[in-house]
Amino acid sequence: MQTSETGSDTGSTVTLQTSVASQAAVPTQVVQQVPVQQQVQQVQTVQQVQHVYPAQVQYVEGSDTVYTNGAIRTTTYPYTETQMYSQNTGGNYFDTQGSSAQVTTVVSSHSMVGTGGIQMGVTGGQLISSSGGTYLIGNSMENSGHSVTHTTRASPATIEMAIETLQKSDGLSTHRSSLLNSHLQWLLDNYETAEGVSLPRSTLYNHYLRHCQEHKLDPVNAASFGKLIRSIFMGLRTRRLGTRGNSKYHYYGIRVKPDSPLNRLQEDMQYMAMRQQPMQQKQRYKPMQKVDGVADGFTGSGQQTGTSVEQTVIAQSQHHQQFLDASRALPEFGEVEISSLPDGTTFEDIKSLQSLYREHCEAILDVVVNLQFSLIEKLWQTFWRYSPSTPTDGTTITESSNLSEIESRLPKAKLITLCKHESILKWMCNCDHGMYQALVEILIPDVLRPIPSALTQAIRNFAKSLEGWLSNAMNNIPQRMIQTKVAAVSAFAQTLRRYTSLNHLAQAARAVLQNTSQINQMLSDLNRVDFANVQEQASWVCQCDDNMVQRLETDFKMTLQQQSTLEQWAAWLDNVMMQALKPYEGRPSFPKAARQFLLKWSFYSSMVIRDLTLRSAASFGSFHLIRLLYDEYMFYLVEHRVAQATGETPIAVMGEFGDLNAVSPGNLDKDEGSEVESEMDEELDDSSEPQAKREKTELSQAFPVGCMQPVLETGVQPSLLNPIHSEHIVTSTQTIRQCSATGNTYTAV
């Protein structure tokens, strides 16, 4: 396959049709064997062509006229994907015309000289002659300036060649060789070549054994599997990573595809636990041990352990870092708006605080990008001058030089004084919201994109530890600053938990939406639902327009019938949200209206699920799964839409009710609530319901999930509450972050 440089004769483009194992893997031409004398003549003629591109094959017909450069009528065979032939050192190339086809002539193209005396410079090419024809396999030109540094993926023809190779070298039976095609296809479906990454050989083989076990296939041994890998992903290199006595062989240049189900295996959990140890950076903190009042650093086995961890997991970390968005940077922090300085401080102290906190946030972003979550606690301890009153083990983790530098720039006494000022509190809260939003977008850049289970679990464990780490590090800081900081980090942790759960639901629902039989069953069950009855029951609570509800029902069924992808469903949900909130755009009541929309959406979908349950729908499980996904994704959309409307970050929106004082009845925005209530009254007046029905006694107070027991007792009689919600009534809680994050409220009627 070669294109003439001059391009004087534009050849027709013909798609190369690859064959299955029993067919020839060459274009439909009459390929004849070429005598040795004619081979040399053809080699010299080919050398006059100035460009031989990497991994190209030129077919030379024995009966055709050999054209000189510029006179060749070129026919190209474009591949639909990267399917390339390249040299494999020490390997053989076989023609796939039949099992008896053997390579009869292999002529190296190193340092070949053309008829004009021009050095060809083809690196690593070979001229192969078999019973079916002559093939010129080249890698690159020396004067091209580009060397072949990437591994190449085999074409379907190479799959057949690999099967024949294994059959001849290992003496595989016909039955076993017929199974190799499925094994090789599985490799192509789940792995891909990439620079700078590697996988342990044992991990690949364990994936393969699991695949064989699930599909009841007979696996080949490890040695034969290694040949399979190299025959498909040609040019792979092997590296031994790890310390002496604890190293393992890795395939370098291959990784699991991002959308492969192998990413969801739990076997990498142990690796991710190790991954959270310090590595790939200079050690910012050294463990210090106090012995007779003298702090001596560990210089023995502790450093060796760190080195072992670093060398063992450095290659694996690159695989998980590809799912992050490391291009994100911290937003610009605003200036501190302060009218009067606290006693004992100067403007230079405020500037020092701004500079130190910026560096502190950049360090946090740095360790998150490298998945070194455990270092966050040490960063907080250093910035807030953590000093445990009673060390339990006689050991404290700190870095004296770093602390002394920070102390010289801003003494702790002045830091504590500044933390009491309201302007500093507000400024630091805004900085935290911007930083945490950037961290969320780094760790989970796309909530619908598949994420490995190991990375998901590591993020959830990280979120679970955040509040405890921060509270412990700020043990000597004023309480008002602690509340402000904890409220922001709580919103960050809750967002990480929600987004990882949403991502997990998305991957589970993706399989359902791609299953034709399940979609047909869902359509059949959905057509049996009495939507008129559902609307009649939901109208009293939701107050939704009948035409809009009917339109949503029709659109939902149509989208389901079209077997839309998950991304198309996401676009549909976004359009529904935009249409529902459009009347409230630009109004102060927009956030409240958005929360009301979430409640109505959840209530209406629960009514549909109830109808499916009562009818014992066969597809109830599928509907329940996508209902959970759509509710979570709608929450995600509303959260971002409210943030856009208010000019804040989603983290700031979620942190609005992070403080108990902020959600107390006395501190709620009464004006906003009154405006929404007046709008709801107008909707009630315009409705067609009888006046008597609308005048029924109502309890207008809604109680969040997990609200305080005393508030319930004073607000409404417990007997009026639905017993099914009693599990959400808890005694005094520290925060109601769960309530504000999920947006779930219940109205006692």
Curated annotation (Swiss-Prot):
* Region (Disordered) location: 663-699
UniProt-recorded Gene Ontology molecular function terms: DNA binding; DNA-binding transcription factor activity; DNA-binding transcription factor activity, RNA polymerase II-specific; RNA polymerase II cis-regulatory region sequence-specific DNA binding; sequence-specific double-stranded DNA binding; transcription cis-regulatory region binding
Q: Which UniProt keywords apply?
A: Developmental protein, Differentiation, DNA-binding, Nucleus, Repressor, Transcription, Transcription regulation
Return the InterPro entries for the record: DNA-bd_RFX, RFX-like, RFX1_trans_act, WH-like_DNA-bd_sf, WH_DNA-bd_sf
Q: Provide the primary localization.
A: nucleus
Q: Name one GO cellular component term.
A: nucleus
DNA-binding region spans which residues?
A: 183-258
Q: Where in the cell is it found?
A: Nucleus
The record's listing under Pfam families reads: BCD_RFX, RFX1_trans_act, RFX_DNA_binding
Composition-biased stretches (Acidic residues):
674-688
Give one GO biological process term: positive regulation of type B pancreatic cell development
Q: Which domain of life is it from?
A: Eukaryota
What is the annotated signal peptide range for this record?
A: none
Family classification:
Belongs to the RFX family.
Q: Describe, as the record does, how this protein assembles with itself and its partners.
A: Heterodimer; heterodimerizes with RFX1 and RFX2, and RFX6.
Per the entry, what this protein does is: Transcription factor required for ciliogenesis and islet cell differentiation during endocrine pancreas development. Essential for the differentiation of nodal monocilia and left-right asymmetry specification during embryogenesis. Required for the biogenesis of motile cilia by governing growth and beating efficiency of motile cells. Also required for ciliated ependymal cell differentiation. Regulates the expression of genes involved in ciliary assembly (DYNC2LI1, FOXJ1 and BBS4) and genes involved in ciliary motility (DNAH11, DNAH9 and DNAH5).
* Protein name (record): Transcription factor RFX3
- Protein species of origin: Homo sapiens (Human)
The encoding gene: RFX3
